[in-house]
Amino acid sequence: MKVVVADHSGFCFGVEKAIDTAFKELEYKDSKDIYTLGPLIHNQQVISHLEENGIKVVSDLNSGKDGVVIIRSHGVPKDVYKDASEKKIDLVDATCPFVRKIQNIVEEYQKKGYHIVIIGDPSHPEVIGINGWCDNTAHIVKNEDDVHRIPFLDNLCIVAQTTISTSLYTELTAMIEQKSNNVLKFNTICSATRDRQNSARNLAKEVDVMIIVGGYHSSNTQKLVEICKQEKPDTTFHIETAGEIPMNILKNYESVGVTAGASTPKWIIDEVIDRINNL
């Protein structure tokens, strides 16, 4: 069986930075406990590995007040920093630089009098965090129905969750532009997301089956699944680990494409490839 790996897959810069930050804190923790405020990234295997090394996940600052609290790669609302400062909690910021850029944009343009529109999932921690940098006043749109609920406004500033699909951004932005005579657009989908999506789409056209490796709660992985299903609706499979590969299905085909989300470590991708090669 022929196994082809997408040109762009696996860890992105922001995820690598967050994990490196966490392990550097382990080296210099000075006997303090280390926590992450929410899962550092959306990959359960990596989170388990961090926990095995003593880095625990907490859901609020107070639970980590006796140690060092690492801000997750998805970022957090602005008031978290203020809260930590007032409580004298030691924070280490592992926010993805691309996410931090969006936070700065919405903070700046809200102060300039713009209404902020975030294209993304309102329940995703990245979007929740971004909204917290414009006083939680953003219009968050996930689909056309959400756009219809936006009134006509004087000034609009549009940003996007870093992991949405480019097609969704293009479609919804065109609609949002009809809601104001003065619209600023910032395509804040990160380059790693675009590269992975294009690479996955091209590979799906060339193979019989697509395997997408990544966390079930990972937004960017879910987008890869959606894109591949457009090309291979019946033979696209989303897995987290090599143990979930549908081997009984793969044996009926000649070629398999493998790609992975931005929070999927190389060792998991390698395990998947090895298992398919041994079919």
From Swiss-Prot:
Top class in the EC scheme: oxidoreductase
Family the entry assigns: Belongs to the IspH family.
Binding residues for isopentenyl diphosphate: 42, 74, 124, 218-220, 263
Pathway info: Isoprenoid biosynthesis; dimethylallyl diphosphate biosynthesis; dimethylallyl diphosphate from (2E)-4-hydroxy-3-methylbutenyl diphosphate: step 1/1; Isoprenoid biosynthesis; isopentenyl diphosphate biosynthesis via DXP pathway; isopentenyl diphosphate from 1-deoxy-D-xylulose 5-phosphate: step 6/6
Residues annotated as the enzyme's active site: 126 (proton donor)
Name of the gene: ispH
Residues reported in the UniProt entry to bind dimethylallyl diphosphate: 42, 74, 124, 218-220, 263
Catalytic activity: isopentenyl diphosphate + 2 oxidized [2Fe-2S]-[ferredoxin] + H2O = (2E)-4-hydroxy-3-methylbut-2-enyl diphosphate + 2 reduced [2Fe-2S]-[ferredoxin] + 2 H(+); dimethylallyl diphosphate + 2 oxidized [2Fe-2S]-[ferredoxin] + H2O = (2E)-4-hydroxy-3-methylbut-2-enyl diphosphate + 2 reduced [2Fe-2S]-[ferredoxin] + 2 H(+)
Cofactor note: Binds 1 [4Fe-4S] cluster per subunit.
Pfam annotation, one family: LYTB
A GO term, aspect molecular function: metal ion binding
Name of the protein this chain belongs to: 4-hydroxy-3-methylbut-2-enyl diphosphate reductase
Keyword Acetylation on entry: no
Organism: Alkaliphilus oremlandii (strain OhILAs)
Enzyme Commission number(s) from the entry: 1.17.7.4
Function: Catalyzes the conversion of 1-hydroxy-2-methyl-2-(E)-butenyl 4-diphosphate (HMBPP) into a mixture of isopentenyl diphosphate (IPP) and dimethylallyl diphosphate (DMAPP). Acts in the terminal step of the DOXP/MEP pathway for isoprenoid precursor biosynthesis.
Superkingdom of this protein's organism: Bacteria
UniProt-annotated binding residues for (2E)-4-hydroxy-3-methylbut-2-enyl diphosphate: 42, 74, 124, 162, 218-220, 263
GO BP annotation list: dimethylallyl diphosphate biosynthetic process; isopentenyl diphosphate biosynthetic process, methylerythritol 4-phosphate pathway; terpenoid biosynthetic process
Keywords: 4Fe-4S, Iron, Iron-sulfur, Isoprene biosynthesis, Metal-binding, Oxidoreductase
Cofactor: [4Fe-4S] cluster
Binding-site positions, [4Fe-4S] cluster: 12, 96, 190
